Amino acid sequence: MSMTAQKALQRIVEHREILQDEMVQLMRQIMNSEVSGIMVAAILAGLRVKKETVGEIAGAATVMREFSRKVNVQDRTHLVDIVGTGGDGWHTFNISTCAMFVAAAAGAKVAKHGNRSVSSKSGSADVLEALGASIELQPLEVAEAIGCIGVGFMFAPIHHPVMQVVSPVRREMGVRTIFNILGPLTNPADAPNILMGVFDPDLVGIQVHVLHKLGAERALVVCGRDGMDELSLGTTTLVGELRGGRVCEYEVSPEDYGMAVSPISNLRVESSAESREMLLNVLAGKPGPALDVVALNAGAALYVAGVAQDIGHGVALAREVIFNGRARNILNQYVAFTRRPRNV
């Protein structure tokens, strides 16, 4: 039986689940502009109140992947995305963006998917522009950057143009919806390994099972007990790990990796310019909480990418490439690559 918007809404208001294949049908209709804005808003709000299930999220993400402009990375060995949902409210500098250059310098291939700021002071796209990089790379150029340098940034509006269909509704609603957690699940390069930060501990188990359904090989989904959508220095971090087809959950703390506990306030910024300054200080090897949190998250990325044996080994590799200048060199190469003359 086909799933219509009306049937879906009826199911939702009765607090009944939409099955994954039904969600695929529904999302295709939404993305093809076959559902009115009023119905889209009602469905999104209803899902939020009911709480989205693993199958519903996986079905929606499947369709977003179908409609995306793909990045074809030839050598997928150690290919990883480092991404967060955002929305944690802490306004830290761009930790995952800094970590991508560190992870690439240590041997991973990073296909980072991101956007401008929505709720933070500086989104990944914003800080990359502040660093002098162009964020307007087309899919072939991103693939070339990953192949040549080991890192590429995929600006969400370029790779998900169909999102314009729901943008007016989301903007007018002004509340979190399923789309806030779909972005990190829809990497256009289909990176088989992923380090994902989420803003809510309840999402750790959900998102790691969604990634399993979507065919990820390895994944770490993390949320600090302080609500940070990264591995946190301020407290323990809840981790959901997918490896070998199995999912497990555990906690890690900064002390596990020889790091001092440090309040998140030490990582806060007020603008992209401040985030840029903190990021460059890290890549220059300036000791402190910012360097520690980048090493911790880059270390986790190196582990999930299969470069490091465990997170601790990854942290050691991350520190090495920060202090020997290789991570800063990767940043410089990437900025130069994005600014080169392009054929029109």
From Swiss-Prot:
What is catalyzed by this enzyme? Answer: N-(5-phospho-beta-D-ribosyl)anthranilate + diphosphate = 5-phospho-alpha-D-ribose 1-diphosphate + anthranilate
Q: What does the entry list under GO cellular component? A: cytosol
* Matches recorded under Pfam families: Glycos_trans_3N, Glycos_transf_3
Q: InterPro entries of this UniProt entry?
A: Anthranilate_Pribosyl_Tfrase, Glycosyl_Trfase_fam3, Glycosyl_Trfase_fam3_N_dom, Glycosyl_Trfase_fam3_N_dom_sf, Nuc_phospho_transferase
Instruction: Write out the GO MF terms.
Output: anthranilate phosphoribosyltransferase activity; magnesium ion binding
The entry's function note states: Catalyzes the transfer of the phosphoribosyl group of 5-phosphorylribose-1-pyrophosphate (PRPP) to anthranilate to yield N-(5'-phosphoribosyl)-anthranilate (PRA).
- The record lists anthranilate 2 as bound by 170
Q: Binding residues for anthranilate 1, per the UniProt record?
A: 84, 115
Enzyme Commission code(s) on record: 2.4.2.18
Keywords in alphabetical order, please. Answer: Amino-acid biosynthesis, Aromatic amino acid biosynthesis, Glycosyltransferase, Magnesium, Metal-binding, Transferase, Tryptophan biosynthesis
Give binding positions for 5-phospho-alpha-D-ribose 1-diphosphate.
84, 87-88, 92, 94-97, 112-120, 124
The protein's assembly and partners: Homodimer.
This chain's protein is named Anthranilate phosphoribosyltransferase
Q: Give the residues the record marks as binding Mg(2+) 1.
A: 96, 230
Please give the organism: Xylella fastidiosa (strain Temecula1 / ATCC 700964)
The UniProt entry's GO biological process terms, in alphabetical order, are: L-tryptophan biosynthetic process
